[in-house]
Amino acid sequence: MRKIWFRSIASLVLCLMGLAGSRARAQEFPVQTKTLKNGMKVLVQSDHSIPNVALYIFYRNGSRNEHPGTTGLSHFFEHMMFNGAKKYGPGDLDKVMEANGGSNNAYTTRDTTVYQDWFPRLALPLIFDIEADRIANLRFDPQKIQSERGVVASERRLRTDNDNGGLLDEQLWATAFIAHPYQWPVVGWMSDIEHWTMEDLKHHFEMGYSPSNATMVVVGDVTPEEIFQLCGKYIEPITPHAPPPPVTTVEPEQLGERRLVVHKPAELPLLLMAYHGPKTNSPDFYALNILRTVLFQGQSSRMYKQLVDKEQIALEVSAFAEPAFDPTAEEIFVQPKQGVDPAVCEKVVYEELERAKSTAITDQELEKAKNIRLVEFYQQMRTISGRANTIGTYEVFFGDFNKLFDAAKNYAAVTKEDVQRAAKTYFGANNRTVATLIPENEQKAKQ
């Protein structure tokens, strides 16, 4: 069944790419929009295939909107928004959601905090009541705040301080960015986590989690009319606050390679690299995605074949770039084998990057990468949750959800020359930061 579905999707992608060449747009589905009086934008896409609903709220507030002393607050509110408000107390949100057959989650990035609800359509009024309560009446109970502060501190210790990959990644971003707030870790610095004040919390919440700073996306067994009516009843009466001040700091051009070395107890070394790249809403977005796919994605990628298959010096290699409002980092991850000097892996990475800059990729590589990207794109759109996240991501990061309908056309338009130009533009030696983790036992052996 899975193979049959994959073939059908692949055929659909090829068909859409052909249509894209004729300036047709990828499968459009109606999305109705409305901006509430308090500034929240609401997007609704009806899908009556199953009696379920996905409701996502995107707040344009992340670690980018913090400063020294308040780092980690956006992530902290990812936790606090589940810890009680005026009508629904601590733990009630999860209990009510589960009792009605639903579930919820949230995630925080450098640019956004996103809250996710999945539930049967019968629970629509209840979910709107819950969301309105925690937006308007979040509880700032000192005892609960102190308890959750401890939870976040423990999370930081687990995922960063005691995780070699997390620690090295934190050090990489703190070194690659010297001016822009992308240098802050999303979880926050431990000293800040320990010293946030009540005033810090209330100010950050009012600033970042106002309806005027949010976009709601609802996908599923709903009609736009009923969603707008529910918004009018539950969400629109909430008083908005001033949004976060604009981030005006521009990261200065990097004029030379930066390097850092971390020594930690570890079984394996680790190599990370960051090249300064563009923001998500950039003309180079699609060309960079194709380049990243050719070089790093899957066992048939250039880097995997060289590092893992041919040279047999690495266990894993990958690359990624997070959605970002401002120029961000193209990050490369290499897991060397035990006993392998990361510098050996580093040399191979540079050789492959230089090859991509000096010689255009092949026609076959280009078409394969386009197919991979489009299959991924349409797989995301299969479910109501994937569609809600994609619609919201395009609305928030590209400035218009309608741009998602141009994805097939934009991928089809990418040429080999575009990919080569992207490699030359962003993957220069002066534009990179290199972070290496050396196991302490190896360091002692060299001394």
Q: Can you describe what each PLM-predicted range is?
A:
Residues 1-12, 20-22:
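Bacterial N-terminal signal peptides that target proteins for export
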Residues 45, 50-76, 90-135, 164-191, ...:
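M16 family metallopeptidases and their MPP-like homologs
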Residues 83-84, 88, 135-143, 361:
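Short, polar/flexible loop-turn hinges at active-site or ligand-entry regions and domain interfaces
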Residues 27-34, 155, 173-214, 224, ...:
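Histidine-acidic residue clusters that define the catalytic metal-binding segment
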Residues 130, 134, 155, 204, ...:
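Generic, well-ordered alpha-helical scaffold segments in large soluble proteins
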Residues 15-42, 223-263, 276, 406-447:
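Proteolytic maturation boundary segments
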Residues 73-81, 291:
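Active-site His/Glu-centered metal-binding helix of metallohydrolases
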Residues 157, 174, 243-300, 410:
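His/Glu-based metal-binding/catalytic segments typifying zinc-dependent metallopeptidases
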